[in-house]
A protein has these predicted regions:
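Catalytic alpha/beta core domains of metabolic enzymes, predominantly
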Residues: 256, 263, 274-344
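Metal-dependent enolase-superfamily TIM-barrel catalytic cores that perform enediolate-based chemistry
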Residues: 152-264
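Metal- or metallocofactor-binding catalytic centers and their adjacent structured scaffolds
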Residues: 34-45, 61, 73-75, 79-148
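Conserved, mostly hydrophobic/aromatic
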Residues: 71, 77, 136, 149, ...
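Flexible C-terminal active-site loop/helix
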Residues: 11, 34-50, 68, 76, ...
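N-terminal export signals
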Residues: 5-24
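Bacterial Sec signal peptide processing site at the extreme N-terminus
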Residues: 23-33
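N-terminal secretory signal peptides
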Residues: 1-2
């Protein structure tokens, strides 16, 4: 379908699916104070730097750590957990997240089940700060799920047996390191995700293909600049067993992306071009599908609305993540039975996870029956 037709229907579908400088708080190993009996919501948060198992390289940068803020939301002695993870491209920081959370007065709320009221208030505090908002959204969902005694996939009526396989990400590296990482992952995952976008793309794909024939997804992270060359590359990638391509061109090249999508033999999925629900109508027709990430869209509530809107437009849906603990990854996984693709491996890339949650069994996501977002805090870890 031509993009102009998509744009017209997108506006209707989006409207119909709309659902539902401050110093950060210091880290502490002391348990969170229990406010049982006062009937109010209480928010605690602290910085927590994520240590990556390997240097992570994409088209625009490399890093060994990811800044993160952990959040705890307590009501009547029950605590829900959330987090804000902030890779460089998100444009947010520990300082900005802590400043936002510092001004969020959640103690005014006495009923955590009024989730829309709470999250609407939070969203009204600023036009941005998506990761900070997601942290509270996740913690609130965890809290309410615990109070209800059920995981959110069950509350939403989703079948956990329909959770898809998740990709495992291979960052940009030398052919030798790529082969080593691929051998580590190929026996555990049914599909691998490869970061591309540099002149070394074909060498990386050939290195992977020298050790495994497992299907691949590729993510250019806006790294390709010429649409004709990108199309040639996509035809070559299809011959190598690639099944989808994420964000091939820069976000300001929407018309070129629409041209590419119309001609591509593989699904083209928006990543950096999509953040919130309101973005779907803007990019509809320029991509075959969208990659929803909680840190971009402000959390689980909006992610669910985005799934509904994309489905109404006939678009493919992927659930993605940043490098995160099992807290945010397990929160996103609650929606996984409703999507086509999952890229929920962020917790597997870090060495200092604070939680146990969703696992991978024979390459597929395995959702625990633990109430809330499906996590258990690891003892003696903050």
């Amino acid at each position: 379908m031509k993009r102009r037709v998509f744009l017209k229907s997108a506006g209707l579908a989006a409207a119909g699916a709309a659902l539902v400088g401050c110093a950060p708080v210091r880290e502490t190993s002391a348990p969170a104070k229990i406010h049982k009996g006062d009937g109010r919501l209480h928010l605690r948060f602290f910085p927590y730097e994520l240590q990556l198992r390997h240097t992570f390289t994409v088209a625009s940068y490399s890093r060994k750590t990811t800044p993160d803020v952990q959040v705890e939301l307590t009501w009547e002695g029950v605590t829900g957990y959330g987090e804000a993870s902030m890779p460089p491209y998100l444009g947010q920081s520990v300082e900005s997240v802590c400043a936002f959370l510092q001004k969020a007065d959640l103690s005014q709320f006495t009923d955590p089940f009024l989730m829309d009221d709470i999250l609407d208030y939070l969203d009204s505090l600023s036009p941005g700060d998506s990761a900070a908002k997601a942290a509270v959204d996740i913690a609130l969902h965890d809290l309410v799920g615990k109070l209800l005694g059920a995981p959110w996939y069950k509350i939403w009526g989703l079948n956990p047996a329909k959770a898809p396989s998740t990709t495992f990400t291979i960052g940009i590296d030398t052919p030798e390191v790529v082969r080593e990482k691929t051998l580590e992952a190929a026996g555990k995952f049914n599909i691998l995700k490869v970061k591309v976008g540099l002149d070394s793309d074909e060498a990386m794909i050939k290195a992977i293909r020298s050790v495994t024939s497992v299907p691949l997804a590729v993510d250019a992270n806006q790294g390709w600049k010429d649409r004709s060359k990108a199309l040639d590359e996509i035809f070559w990638l299809k011959e190598q067993g690639v099944v989808l391509v994420e964000q091939p061109l820069p976000i300001d090249r929407l018309d070129d992306t629409a041209w590419l999508t119309e001609r591509s033999p593989l699904p083209i999925i928006a990543d950096e071009s999509i953040q919130r629900l309101s973005d779907i109508s803007r990019i509809a027709g320029a991509f075959h599908g969208i990659n929803i990430k909680l840190m971009k869209c402000t959390g689980m509530r909006e992610a669910r609305a985005m799934v509904s809107t994309a489905r109404a437009l006939g678009m493919k849906v992927m659930l993605g993540c940043m490098t995160e603990t099992s807290c945010a990854v397990s929160a996103a996984a609650q929606l996984s039975p409703a999507v086509d693709f999952a890229d929920l491996d962020g917790n597997l890339l870090i060495a200092n996870d604070r939680f146990r949650g969703v696992t991978v069994s024979e390459g597929r996501l395995s959702l625990p029956s633990t109430p809330g977002i499906g996590i258990l805090k690891i003892a003696n870890n903050y």
